[in-house]
Structure formats: C-alpha cells, structure tokens
Amino acid sequence: MGTLKTGDEHIRFDGMPTGYLLSDFWRWSSSDLLDNTLRGTFSEFIVGTALDLDLTTGFENWLPWDLTYPFQWQDSLGQTYDEVRIEVKSASYIQPWEQEKLSNIVFSIRPTAKWEPDGRRSDQRQRQSDVYIFCLYAETNRRTADPLILDGWEFYIVPTWKLDEICGPQKTISLNSLRQLDPIRADYSGIQAAIVQCVQGDECTPPPGILHNFCAFCYVILVHYYKAARNGRAALFALYFRFFGRYDHEETS
C-alpha cells in the first residue's frame, strides 16, 4: 500500500478543488461503526492498537489472516515461530437498523482457501491463523451505544487448533458455544497478555499426538452429554453420528 492519506487531501475536478476533502468522504461513509463491515474493520484496528502494531502501513484486506503480531513462541512439537497469526471476528447485539429484539451473537469460523504466490487460490480450505480473537460489542442500549468507548467491548481469545479439533469444518459458532470452549477472556488492556498466554500457556498449546486427540474427544463428549441432559434423545443421536457417522453439525445458541 502507498503512503497513508491524512484526510486533508482535496477532491479535485478540472484541476481545481471542489470544496470537499477526503475527510468529508470518510465522515460520510465511515461514521456508523455499528455497520457490520465497518465494525469488523474497526475491530481489527482495536486489536492492532492493543498489540501496539505498526499501523502506518495501512489496512490490508487480502491476507490469509487479519493481523501479524511479532512474538517468538514455540509449539508443543518444539517448532519455533517469530510471529503470531491472528484472525479477528466481531459481533454486536445492536445493529444500524431498527430492531424488534437484540441480535443473536454468532461468529464466523469458516475455513478458507488462501491465495498462492502464483495468484491462484489453494485447493485446501483451512483456518489460516494461530489464534482467533472474537470481539463482542456488548452494549445493548442504542441511545448510549458508542463503539469508540472500548469499555463496552469483550474479547475472547481461542487457539485455532481448538476450533479445528472441536468444531471441525463448522462455519459459525454461537456465543454460548464459544464460551464452552473455555476461551481466554480479556478487556482492551488485556488483549496483548491474552495472546501471549494463548501461545505460551498449556491451556492454549495443543498436547502432542494421541493425548491431544483424546483430550479433544473427551471435551466433545462432555459438551454433548451436557446438551443431552437439556435436550433429550436428539443430542444423543448427534453424539453418535459425530463419531460413528458423517454428521455435519453446526452449533446454535
């Protein structure tokens, strides 16, 4: 990306200023931070500032993941990495339009195909990051809602391996299901420490081999057992098909 604009640039026609600045366009197009698209981009900006990333390079929308945090860490197999790849997802109870009720909170966790160096899309679909940060704007009062006040945000940090193991190819996850994954929960001031904890701590580093798979199996057993207690036989059938048949299950709240 080229040099970042300041907002003071004139919009010109026939070599003359029209009387409008680039900042006028920004103000017109980007003031409603409750808009789904803008809220997603703003969430990435929030996380970037919390991690003290270099934001002078501008927003890049076509990378396989959203943000890269320079930090040296080691996985359970002893492989060392110099950065943490971060995927940022956002959701909000309130929307720009008039609502009869608050929105259900659902985040996208869809596996994606990345662009290869030759310009073609990879045939393999997977989650590309090391860590997911789920950003929830938790304000429910439209009259007082202001996404610029970061006290109103909640952040849930989950290692990607856990989504892969527990959710498989699932495309979305509800807030209730996300909380069952035992994420690291943080406010704005705790995002950086949560990322470090996630890649260094035992709860976010996958155990090796058989133990890893066994732990994931037990976790899903417990989740489905809990649902069976609430929902009856349907959840037991779901558990059966989860492990003994092809069953594409998307969790709901």
Where are these regions (language model features)?
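Nucleic-acid endonuclease domains
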Residues: 1-84, 88-222, 253
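Exposed, low-complexity/repetitive linear segments and helix-based recognition motifs
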Residues: 41, 245-248
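Intrinsic-disorder-associated, low-complexity terminal segments enriched in Asp/Asn/His/Tyr and depleted
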Residues: 213, 224-226, 240, 248
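Acidic/polar hotspots within intrinsically disordered regions
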Residues: 219, 231, 247-249
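Positively charged N-terminal leader segments that act as targeting/secretion signals
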Residues: 227-237
